[in-house]
Amino acid sequence: MKRLMSLSVLAAALLPVAVLAAPTAGTQEITLSGAGSSDKDFDSTLLNVQGSWGQYLNESSLWGIRQFVGIFDTEGESTKFQGATRVFYDYHFGTGPTRPFIGASLGGIYGDNVDDTFMAGPEIGLKHWVNDSTFITGMVEYQFLFDSGSEAEDTYDDGTLFYSLGLGYNF
């Protein structure tokens, strides 16, 4: 009986560690975020979806690729599409269930309403694990557009903010 009680206490003490285990080198993750808006008559609608795949280099460093797709539908006009593909690197702080991160991304933007061009910028976000493999993520990205390396410095101040909220899964 004493041995059973000791094992039960040990198991109860280790359970939170197992549930809140941080990703390790080689762990992969996928995320999915979305947003949308319409006017009151649904004559103009905007839908955005963003997904990513990444792999941890260690428990703090994550690199990967992000894909954004935007669909713009306005009554009387053809539906317009926009996309952005970029590689990213994020550094995560801490080891608990809530981990802030900072990072940067570089890639391209393309579509019907934009000039095909390069984009880059810093990002900051937060991940909160609800169990060992599933998390909620929020992020703010500052993206600026440029056609060449020499133009990047000139256009940095003319960037835009991109917000996302989504779910992620580690495997």
Regions found by a protein language model. Give the residues of each.
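Cleavable N-terminal export/targeting peptides
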Residues: M1-T27
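Short glycine/proline- and aromatic-enriched beta-strand/turn motifs that initiate or cap beta-hairpins
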Residues: L20-I71, T160-F171
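Outer-membrane beta-barrel channels and translocator barrels
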Residues: A25, N58-S60, F93-T98, W129-S133
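Predominantly the C-terminal beta-signal and adjacent terminal strand-loop region
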Residues: G26, V69-E75, H128-F171
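Residues that define the transmembrane beta-barrel architecture of outer-membrane proteins
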Residues: G26-Q28, D43-V49, T79-T85, T98, ...
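Residues on the lipid-exposed face of transmembrane beta-strands in outer-membrane beta-barrel proteins
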Residues: G34-G36, G51-Q55, V87-Y91, A104-G108, ...
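Sequence/structural signature of outer-membrane beta-barrel proteins
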Residues: A35-D41, F68-G76, G94, L106-N113, ...
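Helix-adjacent hinge/juxtasegments
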Residues: G76-G107
